[in-house]
Every structure is written in structure tokens, then in C-alpha cells.
């Protein structure tokens, strides 16, 4: 029976180009979609750019463009990747669209009416210079456990400790270097801990769709059981902060000025927005298609790093907003190279665009990924030697080789006409059975099993062909009797029928090649469907070259670091070149003295300056203005020693006279990490000592 499916992949964040992980996920989903369509099912396969959030806003600001312009730039390059790897979405959209605004706000209002939205006052770090609340990734400081410097606000990359941002020692804003302050703000929470949500998720995470397929893979189900409380019955779900404060690039929360939906609320809603846009363009009824009681199956392909959002928040949001919940969540692992995490610095990064630009066949990669992917949450390893061996041995040596040998005999001696001696019904039934097994493997996402079975069939076809030795019969074909000619024609016809069946089985993986085989070799006027495997061909056109072998040297080019990266000049120290050389006499003219900071206070009317009162051992105090307000709180500097340019001519400023200059280190770009550092001598130095 024909089914209707709504299929999505995770939305790529629109502040960068596609990486190889995106391409792997899209290929995995594309293979599944193509196989389902070949079975006669209706599939709506949509994607979109995840176009909101602080990272996009800040990157656009840094480049001096609007967030919309940044998103549009990356959206414009998507087709080059998708078309290049034969990934065929029905529609590509964006979360920064009227459809997504309307749907996100509708879902929010529905959840609010269900009593599942709660307002709470929370304290967060706030950057007083940037004028915005800081997410954990924008806060850095000293790890409270191992004391490693410059660690993020939620975890330490050195010791692995997890902590709250408020536990960091000497925290600073990664955006400006300023010391953040704690500030209260009202936020909106989705009450995932509500007993209704917990009960629903306990049922949904262990449930199955209409086809009897579990919503979640076993590994994912086990993980959600941990989050839901496991077998002890104790609910462990926390509520979800779904709001962010202005300035923020996103969707405004209804009736809450200055508040925006957190990007992870409106991003998955983008699946629905893309489908709604597609339905409008195609004249389809969006609401009927996603009727919770309707037959449409909702299927998501995602990576293992975003399970929490998709297996808990997303289905609960949809359920209590009165919408259709997902039927299947297909989770995959990451890509490694030769068993290790990809690394540009080690020359093991794979750029999808570079892959295409150096002339590598997209279907080599599609085949290799299919040969490695399965339905479990496992990482897929790309091994260069294995890649070359599989493509050259399987696709060229086994699969294409059948057609190149058999078609030559048929076109040369039988004018392209195929004829079979014996029971063709049995042969057709054999191909039908094989194709059904492969189709089922693809539907179950056991792609590696499907590929193994296909190549086993190819081996048997080649073995039968070699055992019959048609080249021996062909040598004397001019003088051969009718039986010998019929035998030669039958051997080659059966091989080509097998090749056609293999092409049908490989069509989800190698769509471009299979289409060529169908149209150019066998004269079809449409791409293959699963039922074509059992339709024995009657004619074959002269063989044309179908696939090139992989040149191992291409792999060297693929992993070669980009020329710009290899030849880039060494980074300038501190972001600027060293100053011109001076003599010791020039340096001696500068009188550097140790000074104690007796007092420090903010300067009213200035966003950059602090007023320092310094003891330089002169029997009087000096007044010095310093542009270090973004990095220090006044009280933190009192009592500290520092270094003063003592013989600098006094400078009359708007706020008073500055009698010298305190030395501080910073990057040439004052907004760059890690900010400004006032020089502080070792303990034991005394005010008035000269620095020589």
C-alpha cells in the first residue's frame, strides 16, 4: 500500500558552508527517500537553513552586514553542494521566514494555553560594554577545578569539569574582554518536567509507528530513559528556557517586548515551515498533510549531538500544541578519518567542495558512505585506502565490468538483441526476491547490508559468466551452429539482465549512473522503480563508459591543506607588526617606575576610562586616567602594583589632568580575546623603583 512521508534532515546553521558531516546526513536521507519513492510511496523531502541566533547576529555585525545578508550568502551556495552530490530535496527554505514566525508563535500560544509556559526571573552574566546577556560560549575564565586559563562558561576543555558560569574564576566576556556582571531578567520556560510531558515522553520514546518501526533506535531509547528517570521512576527532566533577551536575531515572543524565542525553539519548527512553503507552491493542503490523525509519516534524520532536543523537547512541543508528533527519529554518528577525529591541522579534514573541485565522482562517495552506514548510532570512518579499494573493486571491477563485457558480445554478434534460453520466469522471480531484500534493507537503513548483498549478487553473475567462457564461443561464432549462438546469446543476456537488476538495486545510491543505465543502455524513458528488477531487458545499446577508476593520487589532493593555509604568513604577535628598532639611548629616555594603585574609581561620563590614584614613592600621589574600564572593576585594582611611564608630559583631558601612563598589554584589536591586562610586577617591588 502506498504511503505518504514527510522527511527532513537537521537544519544547517547559516553562519558557514556545508561540511562533510552535513553531506553524509543528506546522502543518508537521500538514499532512503529515493528507495521509498522507487517503491511507489509519496515523499515530501524538505530542508532549510537555521537562520537565527546570537552567533549569526554577531558574525554579521563583525562583517558590517545584516544578519539577513549573511544568511543569504550561505543560502546561495547550498545548491552547488546539493546538486554536486545528487541530493534532491523537494524544497529548501529558511527559519527567517513568515511561515516560521507564524508557526513558532502559534505553537508557543498553544503551549501557553495548556499551562506549560512559565515565567521566571533568572540571573545571568551580562556584558556591560556590549550591552547584552552572555551565553556560556561567550564567557571565559579560569577553571574552578584545575585552574586552566581561558575556559568556556560551562565546561573545561583541559580537565573536562562541568560547572556554572558563575563558578569561573576571573570571568570575562569573550566578545569584549569586559568583566561580566550578574543581572536579572524574566525568562520563559517550557515545563518539560510537567507530569503530562513526562508521561507522554515515556510512552512516545518507547513506542512505534504504524509500520511497527520504533520511534527511536535502541541506543537512543536507552539514552532517553536515563534522561526521563530510568527504572527508578524518578523524573529527572528539567524545564527548558525558550527565551532570550534583546539584542537578538530571532522571532519575537508574542506580548513580550524585547524577548525572543531561543533559536532551538524555532529551528525544528523550520521543518514545518519549509513543508508549509512547499505545500503553498505545489497546491497541497499543509494542515491535512500533517493532521495528527492522518496517515502521513513524519521522519527526521539527525546527528547524535542533537538527540536531546529532538527526542524530548520537539515531540513534547508538538504533542501539547495539538500537532502531529514524529513517527521516526533516525540518528547517525559522526565521520572520522582513519579512525581519528578529522583535523585540518593534521591534514585529515575533508572539504565537500574540494572533493568536487578536484574532479572526484560524487557517486564514489555516495557508494562508500552507503557501504559503511547502518541503522545504529555509530561513527562512519573514512579510510582513504579502503575508499579506493571499494570503489575500484566493487563498482568498476564487479558491477560495471559485467555490462562492459556482456554488452560487447551482444552488440557485436546479435545487433543488441537479448534472448533467453530456458525458464525466464524463474530468473525474473530470483531478481524480484533479491530486489525486495535490498529494498527492505534500505528502508531499515541497513545500507551496508544492502551493499554487501548487491556485491554478492554481482560476484555470482561474474562467476557464472567466467565459468561459461563466452569469449571462447565468440572466437568461432561465424562458423558456429545455432545452438552455440543461442548459448552465447543466453549467457550474455542473463548477465545483462543481472546487471540491470543490480542497477535497480543501486539506484538509490547511484542515481545518476542508474539513470544513465536505464535510459542509455536499456532504452527506458524513466528512472528505475523497484519493480523493474524483474523485468528482463530485450535490447541493449552499445556500451558506453560508465565509471572511472579512482586514482589514489586524488586522495592526496583531497587531504592536502588549502594553499592559503599552507602558505599563510606567521601570525603577527599581538595582531600587529613589531615597531621600528630603537637604540638603548632611546629607551633610556623613558622613565618607567613601579607604582602602587592607592585608589581607583569610574569616571562619570566615560565608557572607557578609570581614574587611578598612584603612589610612585614621591611623597605625593599622581592622578592618571587609563582606558581599561572594559577589563577591570575599580575595586579589583586597589592595592595592586603596576608600571607607570613617569616622565610622560602631563596631559589635560576632558575629565582632568593625567600625570603619566599605566602600562597594559592588549591585542591590536581591543575587542579581541582575551582583552586588556595591566602590567603587575612580582611581589617585593616597591613604589618608586625604576624599571631598567
Curated annotation (Swiss-Prot):
- Cofactor(s) this protein requires: Zn(2+)
| Gene3D superfamilies linked | HUPs (3.40.50.620), Isoleucyl-tRNA Synthetase, Domain 1 (1.10.730.10), Methionyl-tRNA synthetase, Zn-domain (2.20.28.20), Nucleic acid-binding proteins (2.40.50.140)
GO terms assigned for molecular function: ATP binding; metal ion binding; methionine-tRNA ligase activity; tRNA binding
- Leading EC class: ligase
- From the Swiss-Prot or TrEMBL record, state where the protein is found: Cytoplasm
What Pfam families does this protein map onto? tRNA-synt_1g, tRNA_bind
Motif 'HIGH' region covers: 12-22
User: Residue ranges of the tRNA-binding domain?
Assistant: 586-692
Q: Where does Zn(2+) bind?
A: 143, 146, 156, 159
Q: How is the cofactor bound?
A: Binds 1 zinc ion per subunit.
The answer, when asked if Cytoplasm is one of the entry's keywords, is yes
In short, the EC number is 6.1.1.10
The family database entries (SUPFAM superfamilies) matched by this protein are listed as: Anticodon-binding domain of a subclass of class I aminoacyl-tRNA synthetases, Methionyl-tRNA synthetase (MetRS), Zn-domain, Nucleic acid-binding proteins, Nucleotidylyl transferase
Renumbered ranges of motif 'KMSKS' region: 341-345
Look up keyword rRNA processing and say if it applies: no
Tell me which residues bind ATP. 344
Q: Which family does it belong to?
A: Belongs to the class-I aminoacyl-tRNA synthetase family. MetG type 1 subfamily.
Q: What does this protein do?
A: Is required not only for elongation of protein synthesis but also for the initiation of all mRNA translation through initiator tRNA(fMet) aminoacylation.
Subunit structure, per the record? Homodimer.
Q: What is this protein called?
A: Methionine--tRNA ligase
